[in-house]
UniProtKB/Swiss-Prot annotation:
Protein name: Integration host factor subunit alpha
GO biological process, one term: DNA recombination
Protein encoded by which gene: ihfA
Database matches in PANTHER family: DNA-BINDING PROTEIN HU, INTEGRATION HOST FACTOR SUBUNIT ALPHA
Superkingdom of origin organism: Bacteria
SUPFAM superfamilies: IHF-like DNA-binding proteins
Organism name: Xanthomonas campestris pv. campestris (strain ATCC 33913 / DSM 3586 / NCPPB 528 / LMG 568 / P 25)
Amino acid sequence: MALTKAEMAERLFDEVGLNKREAKEFVDAFFDVLRDALEQGRQVKLSGFGNFDLRRKNQRPGRNPKTGEEIPISARTVVTFRPGQKLKERVEAYAGSGQ
């Protein structure tokens, strides 16, 4: 089950005490700042959570799965995420609990 932006705003409403409009604006603003930083080519480091980086992928050969024809896959920039140690530990503890 995925966590949505609407659910994040609802949790802020429930746990922090922001009203629903403020909570939605807060979540939207957070992702706007994250997106803007990445668009500017900047790394985003969230202490205790992880890092978002941009990585350049060179052009490479690919294959059309329907025809088998070889086609080039264009060079591009992709966003990568590396979880921080605290996040890794919490996920591993949760996964180890059998839930």
